Amino acid sequence: ILWETSGHLDHYSENMYPPINHDENNETYYLKPMNCPFHILVYKSDLHSYKELPLRYFEFGSVYRYEKTGVLHGLLRLRGFTQDDAHIFCSTDQINDEVKTLLSFSVKLLGSYGLTEIEADLSTKPNKYIGSDNDWDNATNSLKQSLTELKVPFQTAEGEGAFYGPKIDLHAKDAIGRRWQLSTIQIDFAQPDNFDIEYVNSDNKKSRPVMIHRALLGSVERFTAVLLEHYAGNLPGWLSPIQIDVLTIGNVNDYAQTIIDDLKSYRVNLDDRNIRLGEKLHNSEKSKTPIQIIIGEKDASSNTMAVNIFGKENMKDVDYKKAINSIKKLSLIHISEPTRQIVI
């Protein structure tokens, strides 16, 4: 069984769902708690040379873990979630460069979403471990050196690493100072042995690669929850599922369609229902849409519109061209900007 080979049934079974027995073909199935064994099977499906390393596999993979009811918490702690999961197979002398690349990627990725206050925990060798002391020391030093070179503040969690390798956990502080664990970079000396994976080295002999696990978002669901907490639900314009709501008063659908066509590069929703404007505005604000364009018959005849922008004073009778051009600038403002700004 795959999960016996990986060691999950021995070391992780309390977090796995019970087996599903299929009587018809006499087979036993498990909901996968992790993606790594499957990436290893992909690696094992072919012979590999040192010239191919580092070899990197990535997927958005769904996993299922039997978390206790008391720790479940919205999107932050789930029993089923999707990880941005990658596994890197490399030689021991490539660990340093790979870790530095991964750490730099993680910090830049989180920063691009506005999470710029990053701290790290470096978990080191526990009392019980596999692999040589030399491998552990080199791997731990690679993690530490990368954190130092990239100027990521970190604290060392002595003896708190997994038995199969040291790791880095990145934590981001949100707008009100709460600390959230997100990215993980984990070095693994165990799974290459468990699955007996190899590559042919420069001396034409078989060698054991090192495996690096990495999930930069942690999970898509948890990362989404952290962003919603960080921005209090008011996501930046570029990240909002709907960027602009066009709200109509009366029969102005042709004018509304002209606006939508001019904003076709953006995520625009048309609300032309025959209900009160106040209800339309309430629904749009409840959905946290950052921009509302309001048009009636007077606007259609005068080529104007009313524009509401999150965090700004509402504006009426704005010239069509001026409003459209300014909205386009707004939608392109980068997440790292402290506020959304528009000049009309």
Q: Locations of the language-model features?
A:
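NTP/phosphate- and nucleic-acid-binding module
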Residues: 1-332, 336, 340
